[in-house]
Each structure stands twice: as structure tokens, then as C-alpha cells.
Amino acid sequence: MEKKTGRLEAFSDGIFAVAITLLAIEIGIKEYQGATNQNLWQKIVENWPEYFTYFNSFATVLLIWMGHNKILNKIWKPSHSIILLNDLVLLLVVLFPFPTKTVGAFIGTNAVNTVVSFYAGFTGMITVSMLLLNLGILRDKKIIINPGKNLPWFHNMIRGQIIGIIVYAFAAIIAFYSAFIALALTFGMWVFWAIATKDTDDEMED
């Protein structure tokens, strides 16, 4: 069977590139009156929570792309439902700069708990969309390349995504008590995804 995911992969990669570009565009310090060499350094240092948020979001989008790329590499062709589920993933990914910018703007204010909860919840929604994509593929197993080898991979990925959804939901709740712990959980999750999406020796040989 001929593999027919090229156009979908190219379109998806373009959306991921747009999302990462939008994240980077938001980083910076606005011009202000009375700027000097000394107070500019102070402004740069004071904005560290914003830099952390953008770094965290970049790593998250990068690892989502890695997992997404592996998913499309393991199917022959996308069905109509798979294309729609893939579009849901892309919609949420390209909107990810919105919660990221919101956290960067309000992390040092009295609204920090709400904004971090929103950020964690939105990241969890992206994970839900990835889970739905994987479940959609498992409903149509004939599109999976080498099912004997790749079905266990999908099952492992689904288990990881369920864990991720639980952690993000917990982070969204705990944010109202400790925004720092909630952000630390989102940071820990991209470390988790870095391990979960790592190629096995067999996959690297393909």
C-alpha cells in the first residue's frame, strides 16, 4: 500500500511552525521612558517569569510536534475522521500562544492563580485532542503500518496521554492554591513527554 500522508504532514508542520513563530514574536521588552543601561538590565531580569513561560510553551509545542510526527509516520493514509481530528489538534496548537501570552502578562499580578489554571487547562485540552487522534486511528486499524509493531506503540502513547490529562487537570485545580506548583507540573510534563516520545532502538532502525 502506498503511503499517502505527505500533504497532511506538510500542512501540519506548517501550522506547528506558525505556532512556534507566534510564541517567539511575543518575547521582548516594551519601550519605556527613562531607559538606562542599568535599569534596562533590571527590566530584563524582572521579566524572567515571562521567559520561563515561553520556554515552557516552546518545549511543549516542540514535543507535541514530535509525537504528532511519529503518529503520522505510522499510518498509510488519513481517513476523513482522522483529518478532522488532526485539524482539532492543529487548531488548539496554533491558539497556544494565547494562554502563553496571558500567563506572561499576568504572572506577577493578583490574577496569577486564574491565569496559570487557564494555561494548564488549555495544555490539557491539547493532550485530549492528541488522545482523540490516537483513538481515532485505533478505530481504523487497517491504516496502521505494521500493526504488530505499531499497535503497542499507540497503546503506550494513549496511556501516557491519559496520565498527561490527569496531571494537567490536577495542575489546573492546584493553581488556585499554588501557581508555582502548577507551573512546575506543566514543566515536568514536557520532561515526561521527552522521555515518552523517545525512539526505541527498533524504531530508529526503520
Name these PLM-found stretches.
Residues 1-206:
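Multi-pass alpha-helical transmembrane bundle typical of ion/small-solute transporters
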